[in-house]
Curated annotation (Swiss-Prot):
Its main location: membrane. Catalyzes the dephosphorylation of undecaprenyl diphosphate (UPP). Confers resistance to bacitracin. This is Undecaprenyl-diphosphatase 2. PANTHER family: UNDECAPRENYL-DIPHOSPHATASE. It is found in: Cell inner membrane. It comes from Shewanella oneidensis (strain ATCC 700550 / JCM 31522 / CIP 106686 / LMG 19005 / NCIMB 14063 / MR-1).
Amino acid sequence: MDLIYFIKAFFLGVIEGITEFLPISSTGHLILIGDWINFSSNEEKVFEVVIQLGGILAVCWLFRDKIINLINGVLKSDPVAQRFAVIVMISFLPSAIIGALFIHDIKNVLFNTTVVATALIVGGLIILWVENRKDSEKFKIENIEKIGFKQAIIIGIAQCIAMIPGTSRSGATIVGGMLSGVSRKAATEYSFFLAIPTMLGAAIYDASKNYHLLNTDDILAILIGFSAAFISALIVVNALIRFVAKHSLSVFAWYRIALGLIIFSVN
């Protein structure tokens, strides 16, 4: 393997780490950029799983204190911790069920540049609409522990829609939260928590299906991609939490729309 191959692995790891938690669609970017740089690997599916694990690990590290407190609270029968754990599972289960049943059909039918471009534009327009509603700043829920069953269900449904490449899991769940009365900052933080079981579940499922593709010749490239995703996700998650506390998501909406139009213009 040459140096260019490892550079491509690093580049895709960075793209995964940056785009996974921004409302701009990591899957869409990986599809587009993977084709653009002609990245091919005998274990391409395994590579995608591993770099997603890098992003998951970054979130777990950043929220380690809250995660430990949550686990301890659940084990000690703390009602607040147990309620929050149930809320997260309610948001997680719809996508877990639909993903397990239809993920292969979704990938076979929807994983193409036309769908990605369309979803980017439509998602961008929805974000602009949500951010510019007259009641957009009248949120009732400012703390993730106050998120209720109604909000959890709406966010869970939104996450199902995000299975369409180009939609963005984080974007859909944040918008779902905001539409149900959760503040932008709280919706963003909840989206990160929800990402842990969602991405971990998807990674375990994909790994169980594709572990036989693992080849020791690509271990170094996989480790490079994993490390790049982990470090870039650490930076992005921290930055996004600070950003959404003071700014709207409109800048990401315009980026999505512009990228979608560019994709249509070159295809």
